[in-house]
Amino acid sequence: MNNLESWEAVIGLETHVQLNTKSKIFTSASTAFGDAPNTHIDPVVCGLPGTLPVLNETVLEYAVKTSLALNLNVAEHCKFDRKQYFYPDLPKNYQISQFDEPLAENGWLEVEIIEKDKEPYIKKIGIERLHMEEDAGKLVHSGSDRLAGSKYSLVDYNRAGIALCEIVSKPDIRSGKEASEYASEIRRTVRYLGVSDGNMQEGSLRCDVNISVRKGPNAPFGTKVEIKNMNSFSAIQKACDYEIARQIEVYENGGKIFQETRLWDEAKQLTKSMRLKEGSSDYRYFPDPDLGPIEITKAQQEIWFKELPELPSKKRYKYVSQFGLSAYDARVISDEISMANFFEETVANGAEAKLASNWVTSDIVGYLKSNKLSFSELKLSPENLAEMINMISKNIISGKIAKEILPELIQKNISPKKLVEEKGLAMISDSSSISPIIDELINEHPNEVQAFKNGKTKLLGFFVGQLMKRTKGKADPKLANKLLMEKLNS
């Protein structure tokens, strides 16, 4: 067995975020996903002679906003370069990217790490750079998930030329859990900004992981290995954990780690070698002669900075420090901006924050999951949820009744007060209405009454249940318990 504790993992992530602009980065071709292959291409995408790329201004805006949200220093001057390599999914035989003068450098992102049976902590992960580039096309392999072993391959250039932001972290990550949480926080951030949907299944967010191991925090870095083909956050964590253990085992058995690219095999839960890793010199970068330099003034940066929303980390802090929520609930609510906004508007409409949190994270999220809906598809208004919560607090309805009417409120988005009045569901809160029913129950169950008086006090629950059955759950629970105790002990 490997002695994992004597080793330290060193991990960095390269995260590719596909920007959700309507047109591609250097042409007006559509970025629509899921259409027939090769229907969103044009002479610029294909690199035909005589065509010239023109930068999409929205791409620059989205990239700068992402940089500012990640605490990066945005350059006032940057340029595009040609990254040259030959592969079937690259129609021009080069990719327009940024090399030595990226859009932004030297930022950071704070990530909350919560693991079972461990103390939660905040990890500050450095970000080396963010640069803009165009995406490549997509290869479809017949009879295999990769080129090797396939009968033939087809190329779909619909994705080619879609705008990407590549976010390169510093090697500050030390575990698979930290890697997956960092990637998750990147996705959360770009979704809040509205610059990407971050959908890993559709390729809108893709992560490559660079991993090495060393003997303790002061030892020199080991040889790094790049891992690709991780399509979920859990896959990122599992791939990192596997590769860390693999490298340690190789070293402890006297072997050598090669600088290579490996693929994560989800079915077999392991990494396997793909190719030796290229260096940057292999790509023969040089400035793109068809694209001029980009100037981004401080004044323009300030305008875009003021347009940034409140980001997830600030919301989590606010929910815990001001609203009194648990760290877990704060994290669940802040995960989606639509959920966070709904929660805050519910509180703004008079609902107590912890009660609003409970209803949002439990009952509403549960309903949406069971009906395969996203939070952005929720029809219920924050005003109506706040009204229902306040009706519970004022003993107008019971929590049980509230749970029963919630699906109808969600489906129709009608006033809870109006619905309760129409269905006669208001709580019975006066003694004169409850006492006669209790008297009937006592007369009908003399044996249970005597057993209660003889010390079987758990029978109180039996009488409460019978009372709720008679009143269809509308009796005030506190008043019901009080009156039952008085009458059973008399």
Curated annotation (Swiss-Prot):
It comes from the Bacteria. Gene3D superfamilies: 1.10.10.410, GatB domain, N-terminal subdomain. Pfam families: GatB_N (PF02934), GatB_Yqey (PF02637). GO terms for biological process: glutaminyl-tRNAGln biosynthesis via transamidation; translation. Heterotrimer of A, B and C subunits. Allows the formation of correctly charged Asn-tRNA(Asn) or Gln-tRNA(Gln) through the transamidation of misacylated Asp-tRNA(Asn) or Glu-tRNA(Gln) in organisms which lack either or both of asparaginyl-tRNA or glutaminyl-tRNA synthetases. The reaction takes place in the presence of glutamine and ATP through an activated phospho-Asp-tRNA(Asn) or phospho-Glu-tRNA(Gln). PROSITE patterns: GATB. InterPro entries: Asn/Gln-tRNA_amidoTrfase_suB/E (IPR017959), Asn/Gln-tRNA_Trfase_suB/E_cat (IPR006075), Asn/Gln_amidotransferase (IPR018027), Asn/Gln_tRNA_amidoTrase-B-like (IPR003789), GatB (IPR004413), GatB_C_1 (IPR042114), GatB_Yqey_C_2 (IPR023168), Gln-tRNA_amidoTrfase_suB_CS (IPR017958). GO terms for molecular function: asparaginyl-tRNA synthase (glutamine-hydrolyzing) activity; ATP binding; glutaminyl-tRNA synthase (glutamine-hydrolyzing) activity. The lineage of its organism: Bacteria, Bacillati, Cyanobacteriota, Cyanophyceae, Synechococcales. Keywords: ATP-binding, Ligase, Nucleotide-binding, Protein biosynthesis. It catalyses: L-glutamyl-tRNA(Gln) + L-glutamine + ATP + H2O = L-glutaminyl-tRNA(Gln) + L-glutamate + ADP + phosphate + H(+); L-aspartyl-tRNA(Asn) + L-glutamine + ATP + H2O = L-asparaginyl-tRNA(Asn) + L-glutamate + ADP + phosphate + 2 H(+). This is Aspartyl/glutamyl-tRNA(Asn/Gln) amidotransferase subunit B. The keyword tRNA processing does not apply. PANTHER family: GLUTAMYL-TRNA GLN AMIDOTRANSFERASE SUBUNIT B MITOCHONDRIAL AND PROKARYOTIC PET112-RELATED, GLUTAMYL-TRNA(GLN) AMIDOTRANSFERASE SUBUNIT B, MITOCHONDRIAL. Belongs to the GatB/GatE family. GatB subfamily. Its EC number is 6.3.5.-. It comes from Prochlorococcus marinus (strain AS9601).
